[in-house]
C-alpha cells in the first residue's frame, strides 16, 4: 500500500489535495492511504509514510526535514506549485510514482 503524507502549515489546503490524489490513485488501481497534516505533526506520522509531500509554502523546510527525519529512509518531495494551485491530484500522484520508482 502506498501511504502518502502531505504536510503544510495547518493541513487545510493539503487536505483538499489529498482527496484528489486518493481519487487519482483509485482511478489507477493503486491501493493508497493519503492524509494531510500540519508540519508540527510530522514526527508522529513519519514512520507510517511511503513518501512525504511538502506544500510549496514549506519548500524552505525541506533540508531541515531531510536532516531531522533522514534516518527513517522516507523520501520527501515538494509539490509542484502549479499542480498544488490547481489541485491536480493526478499530476501529483504521477510525480510521486516517479520519485519512489527512482
Please give the residue ranges for each predicted region.
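Ser/Thr/Gly-rich flexible loops in soluble cytosolic domains mediating phosphotransfer, phosphorylation
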Residues: 3, 75-102
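Short acidic active-site motifs
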Residues: 38-42, 61
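P-loop/Walker A phosphate-binding loop and immediately adjacent motor/lid segment at beta-alpha junctions
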Residues: 2-11, 63-83
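Short glycine-/acidic-enriched loop or helix-start segments at secondary-structure transitions
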Residues: 16, 62-65, 88
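Short, well-ordered alpha-helices that flank and scaffold nucleotide-derived cofactor binding pockets
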Residues: 19, 23, 67, 94, ...
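Conserved active-site segments centered on acidic
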Residues: 2-39
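N-terminal glycine-rich "phosphate-gripper" loop used for MgATP/nucleotide binding
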Residues: 54-63
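Short acidic/histidine-rich motifs immediately flanking catalytic phosphotransfer sites
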Residues: 46-51
Amino acid at each position: 500500500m502506498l501511504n502518502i503524507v502531505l504536510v503544510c502549515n495547518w493541513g487545510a489546503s493539503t487536505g483538499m489535495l489529498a482527496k484528489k490524489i486518493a481519487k487519482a490513485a483509485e482511478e489507477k488501481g493503486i491501493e493508497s492511504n493519503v492524509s494531510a497534516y500540519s508540519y508540527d505533526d510530522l514526527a508522529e506520522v513519519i514512520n507510517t509514510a511511503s513518501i512525504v509531500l511538502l506544500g510549496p509554502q514549506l519548500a524552505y523546510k525541506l533540508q531541515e526535514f531531510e536532516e531531522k527525519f533522514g534516518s527513517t529512509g522516507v523520501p520527501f518531495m515538494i509539490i509542484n506549485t502549479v499542480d498544488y494551485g490547481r489541485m491536480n491530484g493526478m499530476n501529483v500522484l504521477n510525480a510521486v510514482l516517479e520519485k519512489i520508482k527512482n
